[in-house]
């Protein structure tokens, strides 16, 4: 689903390609106001990045293609405040993720994996260092309201 505003505007999208996600919330946190006040926020992202991801989803592209257009405008600002976020992204990639990015304004980081086995293997290794680590996959209908 495409969530806009502060998450209250939800637009269903076509079904997601098959992939698995490992998400980690490190012990450290970031101040949202500090992140948003950083001059490093990449204002060039936004609509173009979102439109590329949505277009890839609508045309049934593979997860690798869908995520190749994903960007987080807050990531550079958050990494400047907490370089460990970059190390956590590297850890995801070293352990088999084909894509990794910070979630929101941080400090959570997720990795995207092409198989349950790859995600499970990474989950075990990463969780041994970061207890707040979880494994999940998108719901097949792209959006479900519970």
Please describe what each predicted stretch is.
Residues 107:
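Glycine-rich GHKL/ HATPase_c ATP-binding element in histidine kinases
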Residues 110-112:
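Short hydrophobic/aromatic beta-strand micro-patches
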Residues 3-99, 114-127, 131, 135-146:
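Conserved, helical-rich catalytic subdomain that frames metal- and/or nucleotide-binding sites
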